[in-house]
Amino acid sequence: MALVLKIFPYANAEIVTAAVTCIFMVLFGLSLGFALLKVQGE
C-alpha cells in the first residue's frame, strides 16, 4: 500500500480499493471469456 501511495499521493484507501477491484474484475472477466472461447472452439 505504501508503494501505491508513493505513486498516487492524492489517492485515499477507498479510491485505491475500488481501482484494484475494477482491475481484478476486468482481468477475471477476460480470462473467463477466453476460457469459454477455447471450450466452445473444441
Swiss-Prot record:
Lipid bilayer topology: Single-pass membrane protein
InterPro entries cross-referenced by the UniProt entry: PetM_cyt_b6/f_cplx_su7
GO BP term, example: photosynthesis
Subcellular location: Plastid, Chloroplast thylakoid membrane
Primary localisation category: plastid
Subunit details: The 4 large subunits of the cytochrome b6-f complex are cytochrome b6, subunit IV (17 kDa polypeptide, PetD), cytochrome f and the Rieske protein, while the 4 small subunits are PetG, PetL, PetM and PetN. The complex functions as a dimer.
Entry protein name: Cytochrome b6-f complex subunit 7
Native species: Trieres chinensis (Marine centric diatom)
Organismal lineage: Eukaryota, Sar, Stramenopiles, Ochrophyta, Bacillariophyta
